[in-house]
């Protein structure tokens, strides 16, 4: 059965992870520019700019009132078809960001070379560890003054616990940035700043000891490069494909996305080394990407911000087979067959109505409240894909009604929103409070506005004394009953009626874990 195999093998599905302001938006734009998906890249200077960099065509297409193209972008590069899944930045950081990482086969980690490894990057890397996702690293902003490159590699290795294999090495930085040397190819690529959509032709100098190099970058920088490379080649790791695929080693590239330099280097690495669509574990068996029959899982639901449209879009990662317009699929959780005739597909040429999609691709299903995160769709087989987690929230608020008579609608709304992954809801066992948990502040605002428009419920938040939450289980029924009896004031049920320990402080949580070694406290839970 060969028909989809060449299509499947061509695909590379990845996401970009970074701390806010490391340059992810610019890189996303430049990746599309190099992939010829957009003709102009309007980069953004300064926070006040209203042209907050959304590549031109992303804004164009508001199909049925929902702008979804920003979430998935597909473009051809080096005989591959690359799917880039956007992970929202700081304005709309949420659990969606974490879950998107469960739908990709590799990640590009972008680091601001002036700052090094930052907090959000650490969190996102923890999530990629759940599936040992292969990571490519791009040290960005070489056109500014940066930290010592060796120091940056050490920090990645020590903080993120992943070995670094430098592929390119910088020559100078800031105003003195002259380019990068490619260790494996023994070539120097000289930097000429390209801005916006101008990609400069790169001049290549072959050989580290070529006198042309000294002329091009100056004697001092050429000598500094040779000295540094002697150190680097002695102290750092060589690239190994196996270790990369296992998530143990990351190839490192240096460049400046703003200056259109170095982006093509990591894209070459991505298309050459990153895995094609991978197999996926389900509850009954492993599903291979080369299988003929269609299967896929929902990893994200995008709510519609336009009150005129009550529609939402469920994002599905195709795991195997081929999606064709009008095909009948089994919605496994509810046991119903559905005909999918209007799925949104994200193709390079026509992003609205492409007729087919293969393993590795992402399609959007119109969802009128029946689809939940983690749902599996198949061509008839009853199976459920695993590994689409709920994450313990980090921010909590108590939610209160302005009109106490609408308690029922409030609960219904919150449970539905939690099924959709917009927020998590906890109901303490000992009182009638409703506690809402999120990983990003914006999630709280979204919930209040959607409760109002979709459920006609006006709600407000109050502070609540909760630091963190963990799902709890215990194999020993007797010990679990004792734990529940003695900790009732800290226990709650989540939206799916799973028992949760609500801790007022981290110290409290640590003490509870010490006191009850037989009880397992989970930071993530399967959808």
UniProtKB/Swiss-Prot annotation:
Signal peptide: none annotated. Disulfide bonds: none annotated. GTP binds at residues 18-25, 86-90, 140-143. InterPro entries: EF-G-like_DII (IPR053905), EFG_III/V (IPR035647), G_TR_CS (IPR031157), P-loop_NTPase (IPR027417), PrfC (IPR004548), RF3_C (IPR032090), RF3_dom_3_sf (IPR038467), RF3_GTP-bd (IPR041732). SUPFAM superfamilies: EF-G C-terminal domain-like, P-loop containing nucleoside triphosphate hydrolases, Translation proteins. It is found in: Cytoplasm. GO terms for cellular component: cytosol. GO terms for biological process: regulation of translational termination. PROSITE patterns: G_TR_1, G_TR_2. CDD domains: RF3 (cd04169), RF3_II (cd03689), RF3_III (cd16259). GO terms for molecular function: GTP binding; GTPase activity; guanosine tetraphosphate binding; translation release factor activity, codon nonspecific; translation release factor activity, codon specific. It holds the Pfam family GTP_EFTU. Keywords: Cytoplasm, GTP-binding, Nucleotide-binding, Protein biosynthesis. Residues 9-278 form the tr-type G domain. Its main location: cytoplasm. Increases the formation of ribosomal termination complexes and stimulates activities of RF-1 and RF-2. It binds guanine nucleotides and has strong preference for UGA stop codons. It may interact directly with the ribosome. The stimulation of RF-1 and RF-2 is significantly reduced by GTP and GDP, but not by GMP. Belongs to the TRAFAC class translation factor GTPase superfamily. Classic translation factor GTPase family. PrfC subfamily. PANTHER family: PEPTIDE CHAIN RELEASE FACTOR RF3. This is Peptide chain release factor 3. It comes from Haemophilus influenzae (strain 86-028NP). The gene is prfC.
């Amino acid at each position: 059965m060969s028909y989809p195999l060449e299509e499947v093998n061509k695909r590379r599905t990845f996401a970009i992870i970074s701390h806010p302001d490391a340059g992810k938006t610019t890189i996303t734009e430049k990746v599309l520019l190099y992939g010829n998906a957009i003709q102009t890249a309007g980069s953004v200077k300064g926070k006040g700019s209203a042209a907050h960099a959304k590549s031109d065509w992303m804004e164009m297409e508001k199909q049925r009132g929902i702008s979804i193209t920003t979430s998935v972008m597909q473009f051809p590069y080096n005989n591959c078809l690359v799917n880039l899944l956007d992970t929202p930045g700081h304005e709309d950081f949420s659990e969606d960001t974490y879950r998107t990482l469960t739908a990709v086969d590799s990640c590009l980690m972008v680091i601001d070379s002036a700052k090094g490894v930052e907090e959000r990057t650490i969190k996102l890397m923890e999530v990629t560890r759940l599936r040992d996702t292969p990571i490519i690293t791009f040290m960005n902003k070489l056109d500014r003054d940066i930290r010592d490159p060796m120091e940056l590699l050490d920090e990645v290795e020590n903080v993120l616990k992943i070995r670094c294999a430098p592929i390119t090495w910088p020559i100078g930085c800031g105003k003195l940035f002259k380019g990068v040397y490619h260790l494996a190819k023994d070539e120097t690529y000289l930097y000429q700043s390209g801005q916006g959509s101008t990609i400069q032709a790169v001049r290549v100098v072959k050989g580290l000891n070529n006198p042309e190099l000294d002329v091009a970058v100056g004697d001092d920088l050429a000598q500094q490069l040779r000295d540094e490379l002697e150190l680097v080649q002695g102290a750092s790791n060589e690239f190994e494909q196996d270790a990369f695929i296992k998530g143990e080693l990351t190839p490192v590239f240096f460049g400046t996305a703003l200056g259109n330099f170095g982006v093509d280097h990591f894209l070459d690495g991505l298309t050459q080394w990153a895995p094609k669509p991978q197999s996926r574990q389900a509850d009954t068996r492993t599903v291979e990407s080369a299988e003929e029959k269609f299967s896929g899982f929902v990893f994200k639901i995008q709510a519609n911000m336009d009150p005129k449209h009550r529609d939402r879009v469920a994002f599905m990662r195709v795991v195997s087979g081929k999606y064709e317009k009008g095909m009948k699929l089994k919605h496994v959780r509810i046991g119903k067959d559905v005909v999918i005739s209007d799925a949104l597909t994200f193709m390079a040429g026509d992003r609205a109505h492409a007729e087919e999609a293969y393993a590795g691709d992402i399609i959007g299903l119109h969802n009128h409240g029946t689809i939940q995160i983690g749902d599996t769709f198949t061509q008839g087989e009853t199976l459920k894909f695993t590994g689409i987690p709920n994450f313990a929230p980090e921010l909590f608020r108590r939610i209160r009604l302005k009109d106490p008579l609408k308690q029922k609608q409030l609960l219904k709304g919150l449970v539905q929103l939690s099924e959709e992954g917009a927020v998590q809801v906890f109901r303490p066992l000992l009182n009638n409070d409703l506690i809402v948990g999120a990983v990003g502040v914006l999630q709280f605002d979204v919930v209040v506005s959607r409760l109002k428009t979709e459920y006609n419920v006006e709600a407000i938040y109050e502070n609540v004394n909760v630091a963190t939450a963990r799902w709890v289980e215990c194999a020993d029924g007797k010990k679990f009953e004792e734990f529940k009896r003695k900790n009732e004031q800290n226990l709650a049920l989540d939206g799916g009626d799973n028992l949760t320990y609500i801790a007022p402080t981290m110290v409290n949580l640590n003490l509870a874990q010490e006191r009850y070694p037989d009880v397992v406290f989970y930071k993530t839970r399967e959808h």
